[in-house]
Amino acid sequence: MDRFIFNRLWAAVKREILTILAEDVSTPEEIDLLWENMFQLPTSKPPCRLMDQIGLDTVALIEDNYIQERYLDGKLTVDWLRENYIQQGKFGQKSEHGGLYTTVKNSRAAEEEIFLLDVGLGANNPDMSTIATAGQILKFTPSSHSIETLVSGQSLPDGIDISQRASRMFWTNMGRSTSTHDGSVHSANLDGSDIKTIIPSGAVHTPKQLVVDDANQHIYFCDREGMGVHQCNFDGSDHRILVQTGLLDHPEDKDDMTRWCVGIAVDPARGYVYWTQKGPSKAGKGRIFRAEREILAGETASNRSDIELLLQGLPEPIDLELDRKNQVLYWTDRGEHPVGCSLNRISVAGDEIQPESKEILARQFHEPIGLKLNTKNEVIVADLGGSVYRVGQGKTVILENQVCYTGVGLQE
């Protein structure tokens, strides 16, 4: 039986490789390199474990695209997956019901690793002359309360997200100063090795929050002083501006903080991108928008007609997080108390958003920035005051020190 299964697996792999070569999509050398990076590294997972890690709903979405492009029958692939797993709430590691593997870890803390960005402004860095390169990527493990430095020497890092599919982290650096046009975007393995520059220094102004679209292998990020919403592939190719709220060569635009784009979230299934424009500090002029991911024919990033204003008059909205399953949008706000320095949410399930339905989930943060929703529907929040919180039934401090935290990534 084992030999029979091996023969079927190997035959399927060979058929797909030969098809790729016949269509001149890749080369033998590139295919072998991809195979080694996907399945033969010490951190690599076998295929079924990898699908559970990625999420079976994401696997189904990727397969839907492939079936549509190739005119294939999905009965024994994605249809079977949805009927036997997804529709039963079995999404993989992120689900309490498991996935292809039915065993679910009992300890929440043991399966949770929190990736944190130390922007370099805190008292943990005694030499303020080194701030421009004092940024770090840290990994915090709640079960052991241990902190590991993965990457150092970064220039004001701000946004980070994890690709479960590629087992890599992606992050933004604002640059040596927020006033200089020298921002950049990078990626690395989850242990901090194999650092790659995705968007080189100077190609963007001040990149802020970044999110990963694993299904399409895209990253999205906002450029604050650059006044835009950006998209590119995992390797930095096909870099596009989706939304442009002002022009750098117009001083009146650059100085208008209501044009500054900061937080971002993406919904691949519905085809939306969400973003915040925070406004001046503590000014109550913050807004949240959304638009289609694809620009309509005949339009540009600067004159899009499909941009929806969802919320306005917010204290100072910063980063976003979308619960795609339940269609709930979360955001941090670093505005003035009592409604600022808060964690908030609103339903975006319908075509029309009801502003009066927004909720404040927790208050009294110290300049909150990054946030991530975990598999228990708890929100991990990090703030510039040096604390990391878990917000569920209540608000709990899970880490406190003299670091200024910005972005948050999560591996479960």
Question: How would you name each of these model-derived features?
Answer:
Residues 108-112, 123-126, 132, 154-167, ...:
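Beta-rich, blade/repeat-based domains predominating
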Residues 145-151, 194-201, 238-254, 305-311, ...:
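A short beta-strand motif characteristic of beta-propeller blades
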Residues 1-108:
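NAD(P)-dependent Rossmann-like dehydrogenase/reductase catalytic/cofactor-binding core
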Residues 121-125, 175-179, 226-228, 279-283, ...:
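Short glycine/acidic-enriched loop and turn motifs that connect beta-strands
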Residues 106-148:
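An edge-strand/N-cap motif at the start of beta-rich repeat modules
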Residues 232-234, 291-300, 346-353:
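Short loop/turn segments immediately following beta-strands, especially the blade-tip
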Residues 117-119, 172, 222, 276, ...:
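Residue-level marker for isolated small/hydroxyl-bearing positions within beta-strands
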